[in-house]
Structures are given as C-alpha cells and as structure tokens.
Amino acid sequence: MRIRKRFLIKEIKKIDKDVDSNLLMGKPLSDYLAKLRNILANYKKLVNIRSKIQTKTDPNELKEELEVRRKQIMEDAQEYLRLLNQKRIFENAREYLTDLNTFKQILHYQKVDRIKKAKDNVNWANLLEVFNIWIVDIPNVDRILPMEPELFDLVVVDESSQVNLAQIIPVFYRAKRICVVGDHKQLSLESTGLGFEISNKLDSYTWEKYKPANLKYEEAKEKRITLTKASILDFLRENNFGIPEVMLDEHFRSVPSLARFTNREFYENKLSIMTEKPEYELYKSFKHIETGGRRYGSSKVVIEEVEKVFEIIRSLLSSRSYQDVQLPDYVPEEFTVGIVCFTREQSEYIRIRLFEEGIGERVYVGTPEELQGHEFDVVIISMALDKASNRSKNHYENKNRFNVATSRAKYFTFLVYGGLPENFDLTKRYIAHFSEEKPNVVLEEDNLHFSRFNFESELEEFVYERCLLPLKESFKREYGVEIEIYNQYKTCGYRLDFVLYNKNNKKFVALEVDGPHHFEGDGLHSYADWHVERIEKLKRAGWNIINTPYYKWYLEGWLDQDHPTVKGELERIRKELEHYLL
C-alpha cells in the first residue's frame, strides 16, 4: 500500500509541485485519488484555456470573445435564477397551500376582526418561503403583515422624505436590516402635508401630554422627531448616527437638456446624465408660453392658463404636435401627459375640466406635492401665476418644490404662465437655460460638434485621418448614408473621443482611442481597472463602444496604411460600424 501511495504522490507532484509529500502519506488512499482527480481535471481545463489563448494572436479579438462569453454567462445566470425562483415558488406553493389560501382571505376581508383571525392562522415562515420579496405601501403593512420582529432580512423604504416616524417604526420592527431611500432636495413631509393629517396644535398637545424622554415639543422639533415636522429621512440625516450614506448619482429619466437644468441648479452638477446621446440632443425639449391674464380676487386660478393647457393637450393627442413643437419618434405612441400645477385650486379646476371633456385617459394632474415620485413622457407646468404675484415667491421658488415640478418629464416640458413677477429669479433662470439653445435644435455647442482643436493626442488625429474620414466617405458612397462625427462628446460624466451618428436611421456608436495609459503596465495589453469601470458605466447607459488600441497604429513609429495590422484594424472597425450604424 505504501508503495502505491508513493507512486501516486510522485505522479501528483509532477503536476502540482507544492504538494506536501509527508502530509499525503498520512492520509487514506481515497484522499489521493480525489486529489489526483481534481488536479488532473483542473490541469486539463488550464491546457484547454491555454490552447484557446494561443490561437488568438490579437488580444483585442480575445477581449471581444471574453465580452461575448461574459454577456452570455450573465444572461444564462439571470435565466437560471428566474427558473430557480419559479421552481421554489411552485414546490412551496404545493406544500403550503393551506397558508396561501388563508392569506388570500386576508386580502379580501374588510372587517378587522376577521383579518386578525386569518393572520393568526397563517404560518408566516411558510408563506415567506413561497414569496420572499414583498412590495407593500405603508398604510397596508399592518393590515397585511403580522407584527413579528425581524420578519424580513431587509426592508427598503422608498420616498422616505414623505414617511413620518410613527408610520415607519412598526415597519422597521419587522426588519433585520433597513435601507432608507429618498431625496432631501425634493419635498419633505412638512411641505407635502402627507402622513397623518393632523394639525400642529394636536401634534403639540399630544407630545406635551406624554412628553417622551422628558423632551419639550420645541426640543423634539429641533431633533426632527415630531409627527408633523419630520420624516425618517430628515431624522436620519440631521442626527449623527454614523449610518453610511450613498448618493445615487446616475440620472436615467429626462432627456439631457431637461436634466442639465436640475443637475446644475439643485445637485451642484454631481449627477451623471445617462441619457446624453445624439438622438436626444437633436430636438427641442422645452417651450414656455406666456398667456397673459391674472388671478381674480382671492382666486388662485388663471383661466387663460387653463385654456392654453387644454389647447396644448388637444393638439398633442390629435397630432403629436403643438405650434412649432413636434414630438420626436422616441416619444411613445401612447405617451402620457402630466399637468403640474403650483396651486391646488388650479389643479382641481383642471381636473374637473378633464372629467367634463372626457380627456382623463393618459392625462394626469396634480400639485408637485401630489406628483412627487411620478414621471410622464410630456409635462405641462401650469403655474397659476400673474405679474402681480410677487408675494408668492417663497411658495413658487422653494427649491425643493421647483425641483420636483421641473423634473417630472422624460421627453418634453411646456411651461405655461399668465405673467412673471420681476422677483422670480429661479423661474427666469429656468427659461433662460433653454433660450440659450438654438431655436430648432437642442444641443450644447461643445457636444454635437467636431473640431480639430478638440484632439487630445496625435493618436486621435491619426485615427480620424486614417480611419474615420475614409470610412465616412465610404459609407456615403456605398450605402448612401450621411455619418456625422462628433469629438469629445460629453455623456455620463465622461468625454468620448468620437461619436458617429447615422442621420438616416438615428443610430449611433462611440469610438474610443485607447492610448498606453489605458492599459496596465504588465506588457499584456490588459485594460486598467478605471478604464473598465468607465466602459461598464457607458454600456449601462446604453452606449455601444468600439475600442481601438494604440498598438494597432503605432509601433516605434506610425504604421503605414498598408501594414497588415492597420489593414486588419480598419476592417474590424468597418464591420463594427456596419453592425451598429446600418
């Protein structure tokens, strides 16, 4: 037996030199065989991988194949998890059918005593085995779920700026961990008046009656723990609990020109605008209309604005256009319209008119407080404002309210107002943001633009002259398409070396010229981590990217056009451009 062991150890060490012979001698023979099988299997895999790598003379080709494989792995993994989840649900549903039927009764019962009795009869551990992710609005949490500690591994609270402490503490009781999501630069609980609709006097009276922690009401307000004055987001942000905070800095909702205003005005340009693409920058996204008219008496309704709002709606719904505005093709056929009113009276007046005229479908109306958290394809902001309303500045130009009102639209915003008071500086900046742009197109002069002065390296200029210009001419000659080339295009917080845009079909692709600093200094032409992260972020925003590395164009000097490496790279880029642009 020992001779056989020594023989096996000797064979193992031929493959794995780090094996400890003395350690193996003391183990059963089965351990040798298992070890040998594992080593041989791994060795065969490595040999297979090495042979595949050796057949790839071009690292860029290998990178592309790895990208395809990785994408396929992600798709397979997602499908596997989906099927695994379905399998778990079906298997557990059969086993816990009684609990499912009882829970179904909870959803239909109206009487509190019947709901409580049904909840007591549910084995919640079984039910959570069937459904492990729940989406519930806060008022229904107590109605549906039992008051059991740590019922969920994680509870996520969205729109937390509108959730008060009394509402959320029972929810947190059911959680092992919590995640609070909200925007402190949008409307807070105090502004919206949501939650428990009680007066400040009742809030103060109740607090002083019970006086938790012996705190006076005014002290409690300062600590942001009163019912009507503070949300869970306010409470966590304004008390130093050492809870980590992460900013979600990628904006996916609005087209670039709309997003740039809110980014600059309210977020100090800290957001990456993930919608910055040529197709969204070739069209108008904003129109302001001064209707004249005024409020009458104590009314906060401007009739002239209301009539203009309905004129716009009828025209959009019938022809997808209004005056010089034509909704682009990327706006959905069944587009939604949100009417944002700065006064409740104007909102209610328009709501009644919508009902009377039967225009309710796909059209929604509300104040910024009511529409926070919602988005619409097209937004009409009706300000109910005249030139004499200068005393209303604090309401209209409250930054949080203005942020919500101006960030509901995905594709287009109409701003309708009777008149603009002299002291409305924020509103004037809002209008000026768009009037700086050209009349017929929405573009930044330095974005949809090409200039040789923008080249940041000789390599960029070389690739433009030897590759992009000839291909542009070739595409026009062979396919009859006009390809626009932009350089140093700003998107997602980065600048792209080149963007190629097919004006015929609105398709586009980025071409990145990767110099030596884009690679690790290992001699293997491996991309640096920061560059990989950059590419991943751009792809997350929907960009198709062609990378061309410096060593395809330069090798101790610029390579000639007839050099095999250059010819191969030109052919590769041409094929990718045909794929993405035609």
Q: What feature does the model see in each segment?
A:
Residues 4-151:
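Conserved helicase NTPase catalytic core signature
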Residues 112-266:
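ASCE P-loop NTPase helicase motor core
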Residues 131, 225, 298-312, 343-346, ...:
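Phosphate/oxyanion-binding active-site loops and adjacent basic polyanion-contact surfaces
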Residues 166-209, 260, 272-307, 417-418, ...:
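Metal-dependent catalytic core segments for phosphate chemistry
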Residues 195-246, 354, 388-486, 557-582:
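Helicase C-terminal subdomain and adjacent C-terminal extension
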Residues 265-352:
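Conserved helicase/translocase motor-coupling segment
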Residues 315-407, 412, 416-425, 429-445:
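Conserved helicase C-terminal RecA-like lobe
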Residues 495-533, 550-555:
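Short beta-strand-loop-alpha-helix junction that forms the active-site gateway
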